[in-house]
Amino acid sequence: MIEKLFILLQHAAPKLALTVFAGFVANAQRGAWTHGLIRWFIRRYGVNMLEAAQPDVTQYASFNEFFTRALRPDARPLAEADFVCPVDGAISQLGRIAGEQIFQAKGHSYSTRALLGGNAELAAQFEDGDFATIYLSPKDYHRIHMPSAGRLRRMVHVPGELFSVNPATARGVPGLFARNERVVCVFDLPAKGDESAKQFALVLVGATIVGSMATTWHGVVNPPRSATVREWHYDAEPVDFAQGQEMGRFLLGSTVVMLWPKDTVHFSQEWLASKPVRLGEKMGDRVFV
C-alpha cells in the first residue's frame, strides 16, 4: 500500500521543478550553511569520508563539489578482468537481452531501442546481447569509470521524465529507465585477434533531483534540457579511454545501464541481482567465439 502511494506521488509530483530547485541548492556556495548540509548528509547516509581524496568538509565550496568528490588513488584497485565494475552501487538486474527486451523488474521490461533514443540501427547491435543495471545510492561515490578500455564513438542525450530511481519505482513504473532522461555513450571495444569490431554502451540515467549529468570530454550535458534527442559523433576525433579511467559523473546520482552485443561478456558468478558492488571489482571476462 505504501509503495503504491509512493508511485502515485511520483506521477503527481512536479519532478522538473524539484530537480531544478535541488540543482540550485546543490550548486549554492553558502559557506557554513553548505558545510552544515554536507555534514548532515554524511551522518544521514553513512558516507565514508576516509576514502575521499579530500576528507575535510570545509574544503568543499558546494554540495555538488562534495557529492562528486574524488577518491584516494588507492581506494579502488582494479581487478584483473576484461570488464570491471564502473561504479559503486548495487546490481539492480543483469543478464541476457531477450531480442530487444531488457528485464527491469517482475512484470516489467523495456526495449534497447527505447533506451537508446529510438535508434533502431544502434539497438540492433545489442539484440540478444547482455546488460547490467547498477543503482547508485546517495552514500555512494558518484563518478563513473570505464569497465574496459574503449574508444568513444557517439554520445546521445535523450530527454525524458525524472522519476525517482530505486527498487520501488523499478517495480512500479513501467519502462522506467527508457522513460527517464538519459545520456547514452557508445564505445568501440578493443579488437582481439580475428574478432569483428564490437561496441558497448554506457547509459547514464537521470532521476528526480539529479540536477545534471556530465562527461569528461563534454562537460555538463544537461542542462540545457532539449525537447528532442541530441547526438554527437566522434569518428573524426575519437577519444580513447583506459580501463578504470573516469568517463562521467552524476551531479546528484542515479543509475547506470550497460549493454554488450551477443557473445561478448561472461559475467562473474559473484554478480547477482541486489548485490552491493564497488568500482574496480571483477564484473566479467570477454567471450570469444
Predicted segment positions?
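Contiguous, well-folded functional domains in the mature portion of proteins
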Residues: 1-289
